[in-house]
From Swiss-Prot:
Belongs to the 4Fe4S bacterial-type ferredoxin family. RnfC subfamily. Part of a membrane-bound complex that couples electron transfer with translocation of ions across the membrane. The lineage of its organism: Bacteria, Pseudomonadati, Pseudomonadota, Gammaproteobacteria, Pasteurellales. It is found in: Cell inner membrane. GO terms for biological process: electron transport chain. This is Ion-translocating oxidoreductase complex subunit C. It comes from Haemophilus influenzae (strain PittEE). NCBIfam families: PRK05035.1, rnfC. PROSITE patterns: 4FE4S_FER_1 (PS00198), 4FE4S_FER_2 (PS51379). [4Fe-4S] cluster 2 binds at residues 388, 417, 420, 423. The gene is rnfC. It is an enzyme of class 7 (translocase).
Length: 651
């Protein structure tokens, strides 16, 4: 850190590698003073306008709000609040088109102005030194201030993280990108307030040196800042050569100190903190005037805009309304850019609102804009590498991005790319390198975010498993303690431990089983040891007697049911014989004889069946005997009918 200060105090300027000198085109907008646009009727305030997380809503649909009233609140310094740009009614809270080249929607508050522009109650102060550094940081946070130089990183978080490390505080007034002049005009017209904001920040951080760096193409701004200092030596002014991108953080630090910020680290790691001049003005307004960040200076430029210049624009104002108020000549063949020509983003929808990020709206005509030429193959001319101010190898990163070799992209320090656009500007093959690098960064971020969520889920799962195991162990311990308490209670009341008694019974049972399974032996007359089968033979005999007894019971049951059925069968057979005999005596004709013989045959069959039934009565079960008797009765009945018919015929 001492090396940083010694190099800075030498007064020397170092030149960084690469860089370009594109046409500045700043005279279009820097000749007119700051102006205000008419107050609009509808404002669209995105819930997140900074690099961080979205705040929590404080309002709902239908609420009436005042100018400067907080619409969201945060839980930390990286969750900045947003504020009402004017007084009016909340019409809706829903997705609305974002100020982004994707044209996607984002959660947005729709505020309809009442035209009164009535402020919320404010508490301005004259002397900021009456507040502690912590109180000042809190006021900066409550005002929703983010870096207005393009990064939109929460200012309070940046200050707090570097509070004990800063030796050199750099205020960036370089404004190196073509067309943009908002910082230039702000320094010319509000130099006193900018100096006041710088002194507030110096009071918080206590750096050893404070410097304002301004490019040499802004002589009016340099003069205004020096006049505002009035000879004070607590803040110095350092004029740097005009070169793009000298306003980038790492490049400006190298210009002033000759020291490079290590890859992957912040400038605070070498004792340097940098802030934009617009951010210093916002800090002064927040601390002294108690005004949140609800407006900023925006450059309106390009040949398609009639009233070029720099305007105070309320955050949330639709871009289409701003352009209309500035005399924009709509032409579908020419896009609108948010930002400058090098790092700006093409807007697909002009209904998108102005946010804290927007410092310029560029509307070029055919003299300033041409359709992108067809992309050609890389010829490896090294023009991009020679011009890169970060010492990267854009052609190699291009191949890695095309092949989605994310590991190689990271190895070649893609994260250090500041997206200045120089590589694409100098490429003779018209390769849109910045688009490839932005897409590759987004893919790597998605992969890491997915891995981060996976790791977090794994940690949560393992924590849950550990908790469940701990709870199970605690449950078992409670059960064991309760069981022990019950045993002790029973032991006190009955005089013995029930568990021990149960174990003793179990041991005794096992011992008996062991004895019963031992093989008994006896000694023969010859002295041989033979197995003693006495018990086994007794068991077999008992089983045999049990089977015989069961069979005898079944036989007795059958005999009790058979006599009745057999007697009925004998009676039926006797009746049948009597009828057949009578029929034989009565019939003298051959037909009668024949029928008599038939009847006798039937009788014989019946008799035989009955005799067979009688013989087998002991072998058949009662059910079969009954069936046989029924069949015999049916045959006898049929025979009787035949006899009656013959007698009638003889008469």
């Amino acid at each position: 850190m001492a090396d940083v200060l010694s190099r800075f105090n030498s007064g020397k300027l170092w030149d960084f590698k690469g860089g370009i000198h594109p046409p500045e085109m700043k005279s279009q907008s820097n000749s007119q003073p700051l102006r205000h646009l008419p107050l609009g009727t509808d404002f669209y305030i995105p819930l997140k306008q900074h690099l961080g997380t979205t705040g929590n809503l404080l309002i709902k649909e239908g609420d009436y709000v005042l100018k400067g009233q907080a619409l969201t609140k945060g839980d930390g310094l990286r969750m900045l609040p947003v504020h009402a740009p004017t007084s009016g009614t909340i019409k809706s809270i829903k997705p609305y088109v974002a100020t982004h080249p994707s044209g996607l929607d984002e959660p947005t508050i729709h505020l309809q102005s009442d035209g009164l522009d009535q402020w919320i109650e404010r508490n301005p102060i004259d002397d900021f030194s009456t507040l502690s550094p912590e109180q000042l940081i809190h006021k900066i946070y409550q005002a929703g201030i983010a870096g207005l130089g393009g990064a939109v990183f929460p200012t309070a978080a940046k200050i707090q993280s570097a509070e004990q490390k800063v030796k050199l505080l750099i205020i960036n007034g370089a404004e190196c990108e073509p067309y943009i002049t908002c910082d230039d005009r702000l320094m010319r017209e509000r130099a006193d307030e900018i100096i006041k904001g710088i002194r507030i920040l110096r009071y918080i951080l206590h750096p050893e040196k404070v410097v304002i760096a301004i490019e040499d193409n802004k002589p009016e701004a340099i003069s205004a800042i020096r006049n505002a200092l009035q000879g004070a030596n607590d803040i110095s002014v350092r004029v740097i050569p005009t070169k793009y991108p000298s306003g980038a953080t790492k490049q400006l630090i190298y210009l002033l100190t000759g020291i490079e910020v290590p890859s992957g680290e912040r400038s605070s790691s070498i004792g340097v903190l940098m802030q934009n001049v617009g951010t210093m003005f916002a800090i002064k307004r927040a601390v002294i005037n108690d005004e949140p960040l609800i407006e900023r200076v925006v450059t309106l430029t390009g040949n398609k805009i009639a009233e070029k210049g720099n305007y105070w624009v309320r955050l949330g104002t639709p871009i289409s309304q701003i352009l209309s108020d500035a005399g924009y000549q709509f032409d579908k063949h020419f896009p609108i850019f948010a930002g400058g020509p090098m790092m700006g983003l093409e807007l697909p929808n002009l209904n998108a609102p102005v946010t804290k990020l927007v410092n310029c709206l560029l509307a070029p005509d055919y003299l300033e804009y041409a359709e992108p030429e067809a992309e050609q193959a890389c010829i490896r001319c090294s023009s991009c590498s020679d011009a890169c101010p970060v010492n990267l190898m854009p052609q190699q990163l291009y191949w890695f991005a095309r092949s989605e070799d994310h590991k190689k992209s990271e190895e070649y320090a893609l994260k250090d790319c500041i997206e200045c656009g120089i590589c694409a500007y100098v490429c003779p093959s018209h390769i849109p390198l910045i688009q490839y690098f932005r897409q590759e960064k987004a893919k790597i971020w998605q992969i890491k975010e997915k891995q981060k969520k996976s790791d977090e889920a794994k940690i949560r799962f393992e924590a849950k498993q550990a908790r469940m195991e701990r709870e199970e162990q605690e449950r078992k311990a409670r059960s064991q303690r309760a069981a022990q308490a019950r045993r002790e209670e029973l032991a006190q009341t009955k005089g013995e431990d029930p568990v021990k008694a149960a174990l003793e019974r179990l041991k005794a049972k096992k011992a008996n089983e062991t004895e019963s399974t031992q093989i008994k032996t006896l000694t023969s007359e010859k002295g041989e040891v033979l197995p003693d089968n006495t018990d086994l033979m007794a068991q077999r005999k008992a089983r045999r007697l049990a089977r015989q007894q069961a069979a005898s019971q079944v036989e007795n049951q059958e005999q009790q049911t058979q006599p009745t059925d057999a007697k009925k069968a004998v009676v039926a057979a006797a009746i049948a014989r009597a009828k057949a005999k009578k029929l034989a005596q009565a019939n003298s004709t051959s037909e009668a004889i024949s029928n008599s013989q038939t009847a006798e045959n039937e009788v014989e069959k019946t008799k035989s069946a009955v005799e067979k039934t009688q013989e087998n009565s002991t072998a058949l079960d009662p059910k079969k005997a009954a069936v046989a008797a029924a069949i015999a009765r049916a045959k006898a009945k049929k025979l009787a009918k035949t006899q009656t018919t013959l007698e009638n015929n003889q008469e």
